[in-house]
């Protein structure tokens, strides 16, 4: 039994509970923990605790099988809490409205609540310190605070920040899941009446969600195969013999095969982009997506090259087309650069790779850390480049550091610990500067990398949980569609319920899922 001494002068627990009147009352369950306590302690004589002097000075509180002997003066300090209301109870019915059970013989109050959370709350009532438990979900602890009548404002600032963060995450997940479940329920209810919406839905699942079924997996495999073929053809097109034929204006069978292969790949990518644009509800938002912008930058150079080649052929056949050919030759350099953008097709793998999606999300979230890393690098580069130039300028035998701008390259390579060896300090002062730049580069680059690593881990966990929720939602949708297919028209009416009903039905499961994610 835990004995908690009271605090007569109220130095630690003089808190205001004016706002607790708005807290909702929680219904209690009767008799469960009283019987449990009897089973746990069958041979223990509890009546000896019910002495007359102890009953006037102490109260016994049994929470989850753990007993606390608390002075009444401690509970009087917080009269608006659930425990503080015990002092003002005048009859048995009022007591049973506050606790789960009550033993009159030994003046023991039973509460069927979490004992770990109550230990923290009891510490707050006696010492005035309220903190979250690491082993307990923050949202579950919030429910315990509401039950016992404790305000969240009394939490320590770090714990309050953690609780607010979990509340925001749970609210976002609840809203997102509610909207998704309602939209899917509505689509299932009216799929027979709207054939076009059913086709658009299946098309969206096929091109956007590889885990939606066999068509989505086949589509993703074909897309990945074409990306790999494009990367291989780009590498082959840069071979010396192919480049020589292209410079001479000749076209061998190998060059022709590469062109045909590239044409087939671009045709597939164009077809895929067209399908994605058709199923998109908001066309403007679709075009602003980074991956779609990459698709446009990778596809357009091929068509621009075809148009320019056709124009150069027409101009060369005309008598006065020499000036046009010169202009096209100038444009040829730009076209070669545009054709090199075909390597951007590799970024399309991010549609099907959780790791690449995590990398992109980490880069977007860590822009400040990357800017800080770049700032550290620039400051160190501006510091060590003049020093190594001044240290090596006295060496007249072989001076590799001809100016401060040329020393910038050496400083960057040294601080990143790459060390190509093209520029090496020869003098002892220059070597001391080089050693300092290497050590400072290791230390300066390690500071932001730690934060970036934690962001990457958190982003990966979030995307993985989101993927698992999507898979569970698809399983739920499949089960609902199976029930609707075999249940008749009465279940179709149930599936087409209004949005409020759909969200209320799914809310408890979403709350439990949000708590598990904590």
Swiss-Prot record:
Composition bias, Basic and acidic residues: 501-518
Protein name: Voltage-gated potassium channel regulatory subunit KCNG2
CDD domains per the UniProt record, alphabetical: BTB_POZ_KCNG1_2
Motif (Selectivity filter): 417-422
Disulfide bonds listed in the record: none
Topological region Extracellular: 237-257, 312-331, 390-404, 425-431
Record GO biological process: action potential; potassium ion transmembrane transport; protein homooligomerization; regulation of potassium ion transport
Segments of this protein annotated with the region Disordered: 473-518
GO MF term set: potassium channel regulator activity; voltage-gated potassium channel activity
Sequence ranges marked intramembrane in UniProt: 405-416, 417-424
Topology relative to the membrane: Multi-pass membrane protein
Protein family membership: Belongs to the potassium channel family. G (TC 1.A.1.2) subfamily. Kv6.2/KCNG2 sub-subfamily.
Subunit structure: Heterodimer with KCNB1.
Compartmental location: Cell membrane
Described function: Regulatory alpha-subunit of the voltage-gated potassium (Kv) channel which, when coassembled with KCNB1, can modulate the kinetics and conductance-voltage relationship. Modulates channel activity by shifting the threshold and the half-maximal activation to more negative values. Potassium channel subunit that does not form functional channels by itself.
Record keywords: Cell membrane, Ion channel, Ion transport, Membrane, Potassium, Potassium channel, Potassium transport, Transmembrane, Transmembrane helix, Transport, Voltage-gated channel
Superkingdom per UniProt: Eukaryota
Membrane-traversing stretches: 215-236, 258-279, 291-311, 332-352, 368-389, 432-460
SMART domains linked to this entry: BTB
Residues on Cytoplasmic side: 1-214, 280-290, 353-367, 461-518
GO CC annotations, alphabetized: membrane; voltage-gated potassium channel complex
């Amino acid at each position: 039994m835990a004995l908690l001494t009271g605090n007569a002068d109220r130095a630690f627990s003089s808190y205001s509970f004016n706002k607790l009147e708005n807290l909702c009352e929680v219904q209690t369950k009767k008799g469960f923990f009283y019987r449990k306590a009897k089973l746990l302690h069958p041979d223990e004589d509890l009546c000896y605790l019910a002495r007359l002097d102890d009953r006037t000075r102490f109260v016994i509180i049994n929470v989850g099988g753990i007993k606390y002997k608390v002075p009444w003066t401690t509970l009087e300090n917080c009269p608006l809490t659930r425990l503080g209301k015990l002092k003002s109870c005048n009859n048995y019915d009022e007591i049973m409205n506050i606790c789960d059970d009550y033993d009159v013989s030994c003046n023991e109050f039973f509460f069927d609540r979490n004992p770990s959370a109550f230990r923290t709350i009891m510490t707050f009532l006696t010492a005035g310190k309220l903190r979250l438990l690491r082993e307990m979900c923050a949202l579950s602890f919030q429910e315990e605070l509401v039950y016992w009548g404790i305000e969240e404002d009394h939490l320590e600032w770090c714990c309050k920040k953690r609780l607010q963060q979990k509340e925001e995450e749970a609210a976002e997940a609840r809203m997102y899941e509610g909207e998704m479940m309602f939209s899917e329920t509505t689509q299932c209810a009216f799929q027979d009446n709207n054939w076009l919406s059913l086709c658009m839905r299946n098309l969206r699942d096929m091109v956007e969600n590889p885990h939606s079924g066999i068509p989505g997996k086949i589509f993703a495999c074909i897309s990945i195969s074409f990306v790999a073929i494009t990367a291989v053809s780009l590498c082959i097109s840069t071979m010396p013999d192919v480049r020589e034929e292209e410079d001479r204006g000749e076209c061998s069978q190998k060059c022709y095969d590469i062109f045909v292969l590239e044409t087939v790949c671009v045709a597939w990518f164009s077809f895929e982009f067209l399908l994605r644009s058709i199923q998109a509800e908001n066309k403007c938002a679709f075009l602003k997506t980074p991956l779609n912008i990459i698709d446009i930058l990778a596809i357009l150079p091929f068509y621009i090259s075809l148009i320019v080649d056709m124009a150069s052929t027409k101009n060369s056949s005309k008598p006065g087309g020499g000036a046009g050919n010169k202009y096209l030759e100038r444009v040829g350099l730009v076209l070669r650069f545009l054709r090199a953008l075909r390597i951007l097709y590799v970024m399309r793998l991010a549609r099907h790779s959780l790791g690449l999606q995590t990398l992109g999300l980490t880069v977007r979230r860590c822009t400040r850390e990357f800017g800080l890393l770049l700032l550290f690098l620039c400051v160190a580069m501006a510091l060590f480049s003049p020093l190594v130039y001044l240290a090596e300028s006295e060496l007249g035998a072989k001076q590799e550091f001809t100016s401060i701008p040329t020393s910038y390259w050496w400083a960057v390579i040294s601080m990143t610990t790459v060390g190509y060896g093209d520029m090496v300090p020869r003098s002892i002062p220059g070597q001391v500067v080089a050693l300092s730049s290497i050590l400072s580069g290791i230390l300066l680059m390690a500071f932001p990398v730690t934060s970036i690593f934690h962001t990457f881990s958190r982003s990966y966990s979030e995307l993985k949980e989101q993927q698992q929720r999507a898979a569970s939602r698809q399983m739920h949708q499949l089960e609902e569609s199976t029930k609707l297919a075999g249940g008749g028209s009465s279940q179709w009416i149930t599936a087409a319920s209004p949005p409020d009903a759909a969200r209320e039905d799914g809310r408890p499961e979403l709350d439990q899922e949000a708590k598990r994610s904590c």
